[in-house]
Amino acid sequence: SIALYRPSVAVLNNIALDHKSMEELRTLFAAFLSRARTSVLNLDNAETRRLAETLALPDMLTYSLEDPGAAFRASDVVSAPDGMSCIVAERATGEQARVCVQTPGRHNLSNALAAIAAARACGVSLREAAQALMGFVGIRRRLEVVGSARDIVVIDDFAHNPDKIAATLSTLHQFPGRLLVMWQPHGYG
C-alpha cells in the first residue's frame, strides 16, 4: 500500500477520484509526499498543485506542460497519433533538451516530464533523461495498437476512471477518421 511507502523520490502525477474519497486521497498523498526525500509534482492537475502550494516539503520539483513557473516545463509541443515531442526547459539551470516519446497524448508527455524530473532528482542529466525516453514505447493496454485491417485500427486502453477515460478519448480524437469506442464499466470509489 502507498501508505507504507518511504520513497527517496516520490512522483505525484495527479489526484482524481479513484477508490477513495477526495479528502482521503488528499490526506494519503500528502503523507506519501512528506515521507520522501524529494517530491515531484504536476502543476497541471489542480489537486496536485494545491498540495505543492500548501505542503512544506523539504525538496520539491514541479513540472508542467503549461505553467512557466514549474521547475521543468514543456514548450513547442507537437502532437501526432504515434507520439509527442517538445522542448523541456529546466528552470534552475536554464538547460533545454528535445524530448520525443513514442506514445500519443498530452498525458503521456506529462508522464515523460515527471520521469525527467525524477531522473534529475537522482543525478541524471537532462539530456541523458531525454535520450532514455526516446526508447520507451509504452506499456500494454495503454493506447496499445492490437491490430489493423482495411484501414481500421484497433486500440486497447485500460482507462478505468473518468479522468483517464477523458485523457484517452482526447488523444484518440487526434487520430484521423471516425471513432467507435467500446467501454467496459468498472467500479471506482
Residue ranges and their predicted role:
Residues 45-46, 160-164:
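Short beta->alpha connector loops
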Residues 154-160:
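Switch II (G3) loop of P-loop NTPases
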Residues 139, 163-189:
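Active-site beta-alpha connecting loops in nucleotide-dependent enzymes
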Residues 109-112, 162-166:
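Short glycine/serine/threonine-rich phosphate/pyrophosphate-binding segments
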Residues 3-154, 177:
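Acidic, Mg2+-coordinating active-site environments of NTP-dependent enzymes
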Residues 41-44, 158, 185-186:
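Structural motif
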